[in-house]
Amino acid sequence: MVATTLALAALQALAAGEAKNVIFFLGDGMGPVTVTASRIYKYGEAGQLTMETLPRTARIRTYTLDAQTPDSAPTMSAYMTGAKIRNEVLSMDANTVAKPPSADTSVTPSVGNAINNCPATGNGASVPTLLEQSIAKGKASGVVTTARLTHATPAATYAHICHRDAEYDIARQAVPGGAGFNPALDTGIDVLMGGISSYWRPYNAAVTPRGRPDGRDLVTELQAKGYTAVNDLASLNAASVSGRLIGLFDQALAQGHMSYELDRDPAKEPSLAQMTSKAIDILSKNPNGYFLMVEGGRIDHALHGTNAKRALADTISFDDAIKAALGKV
């Protein structure tokens, strides 16, 4: 996996030494070839993507403690924590060894990856993330993605666990006051938006066969903590910018991820730019500033599937989100 990352901060604040607001954009799987092809696809050879107009560009070498080819978990964790770790691990230290989850057979049919096998002690320690450090400074926080909210890239901002596939435990780390909550999030993340997945809903053999065997409804728990829950474009547009938001969008029905841009129904499912704009509107209410992570998560999925057109369209959608953000900061 190759990732190109753009971090946006007000240039005035940069000159002063510390940014009030930070928007961290991550195009998952989006390497130089994909960027070049997307530019030509949208604007022609002489055109420019919005991301290409930014004043600074850098390249990185990606490898982990145990592999030359990394996955999204240790790479995003490196961005968020500054720590080089092992493949599959999320925002833990170099002493952490990945231990995959196993199926929960207490229900029929069984639910894969529902049992977290990470030892409670003796397998490394968590490392603070940029999002957590921003919360500690009194800033608002947000996570927006076109992938599942519990997928490796978004999870690295708010969760600490020895294996990225333990998504049932990753989800509960985001729910304030509940069992398994990550206390470094204080009262919780202000904005959460991404593809829906069963990791947030209770198990039901007929309706949510991949739901939570522990029976918890994490969306209901978040609503009890003051979050507004939305699931389509209309409810997102109607949501107040004065409160907290959990958006889980299920139109794609594709492993919990949102639709590819080419397949998205613009009347029902929000674009990444629309989600980014809404997140900024909400987070901007905090006078101390905010930290927002925005992932174009399906670029990588299209490239894995050797589907060039979908990859290019999702890269352009990601670039549109950057343009939308620049229009608001």
Predicted regions and their residues:
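Bacterial N-terminal signal peptides that target proteins for export
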Residues: 1-2
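N-terminal signal peptide c-region/cleavage motif recognized by signal peptidases
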Residues: 10-12
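Secondary-structure transition/capping motifs at alpha-helix termini
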Residues: 16, 285-287, 325-329
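N-terminal catalytic scaffold of extracellular/periplasmic and nuclease hydrolases
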Residues: 16-244, 251, 266, 315-319
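Active-site His/acidic residue clusters
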Residues: 152-159, 253-264, 288-289, 293-326
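Flexible, glycine/charged-enriched surface loops at secondary-structure junctions
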Residues: 184, 232, 287-293, 329
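Accessory "access/gating" subregions that flank catalytic or transport cores
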Residues: 249, 259-288, 299-300
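Generic, well-ordered alpha-helical scaffold segments in large soluble proteins
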Residues: 278-282, 321-328
